[in-house]
Design a protein with these regions (language model features):
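Short, Lys/Arg-rich, polar N-terminal cytosolic tail immediately upstream
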Residues: 1-10
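Hydrophobic alpha-helical transmembrane segments of polytopic
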Residues: 14-24, 57-60, 64, 80-90, ...
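Hydrophobic transmembrane helix segments
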Residues: 15-59
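Hydrophobic residues within the alpha-helical transmembrane core of Major Facilitator Superfamily
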Residues: 26, 62, 69, 92, ...
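Non-cytosolic membrane-interface motifs at loop->transmembrane helix junctions
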Residues: 45-49, 104-113
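Juxtamembrane helix-break-helix junctions at the cytosolic face
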Residues: 66-80
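Membrane-helix boundary connector in multi-pass membrane proteins
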Residues: 76-79, 85-110, 127-130
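Membrane-water interface at the C-terminal end of transmembrane alpha helices
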Residues: 115-130
Length: 130
């Protein structure tokens, strides 16, 4: 059985990953909500722009970030697991949309890694009995 300091460090790492996934999603929501015409300025967003406006994407990202915040604030393991799965899935969707728009962008890999981290975190949490 792992020692108490190891379990505490492992819990802190899981919370840090969860917080990072939430913060990146919230940051993307804020960037798209600002009146900067992000979709116009970057060809990497053209697939997202074809699907919905910046404001709609900002609302969707903020909703997902809110689910992440709820998961961070609760002690319920099922809610935490569910929120991480929602965050990881949205990061994966964003990675896929960037890949469709511009495969050479670094955003594809960045959001893909974040999605993988989220799914790893979900696996660890479910493996430990949520």
């Amino acid at each position: 059985m792992p020692s108490a300091p190891f379990r505490r460090a492992s819990r802190d790492a899981r919370l840090a990953i969860h917080a990072a996934l939430t913060a990146v999603m919230a940051w993307l929501a804020i960037v798209l909500a600002l009146p900067t015409d992000t979709f116009v300025s970057s060809p990497s967003f053209h697939v997202m722009a074809a699907m919905a406006s910046e404001d709609h994407w900002a609302m969707a990202f903020w909703l997902v970030a809110s689910v992440g915040f709820a998961g961070l604030l609760t002690q319920d393991g099922v809610v935490r697991l569910g929120s991480v799965l929602v965050l990881a899935t949205m990061h994966g969707v964003v990675a896929g949309l960037f890949a469709l728009a511009n495969p050479a962008t670094t955003a594809t890999g960045t959001y893909g890694v974040l999605a993988a981290l989220g799914y790893y975190l979900a696996w660890r949490r479910s493996d430990e009995g949520v």
